[in-house]
Amino acid sequence: MANITAKDVAALRAKTGIGMMECKKALVEADGDVEEAIKILRKRGELKAEAKAARIAADGIVDVMKEGNVTAMIEVNSETDFVAKNASFQEFVKNLLKTIIANKPADVDALMASTYIDGATTVEAKLKEMIFVIGEKISIRRFVVVNGLART
């Protein structure tokens, strides 16, 4: 059994954004192996995301981003307005807009299968991670992409 220090737990927390106790439990289970602990935390995140799927997410935000001649607008829902005001939630929504502009998916299902803007994971995996970190159901309700100039 590895000797887990507070520094180890803090480093894992800094990498993942997940609570100290969850990080400590994952490190103990992984016998101090940080990469294995991250895998354990991802698996737990997926399980928690599935458990929260039936909840109602009626709050949230609508955001818009323009890059060149491409504009994207998205609605992302959360269970409470408190989460909608959270900086990491808002950053996630901005990154979703960047992902939409880069990939131009046809619908929400295609967006979920797209590579997230960081290139390391899919949008679906990042969404599950956000649900685990924030602790509430988060759902991508809808989005639209306008390519070119709109005239009225």
Residue ranges and their predicted role:
Residues 2-152:
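N-terminal assembly/interaction segments in proteins that build large macromolecular machines
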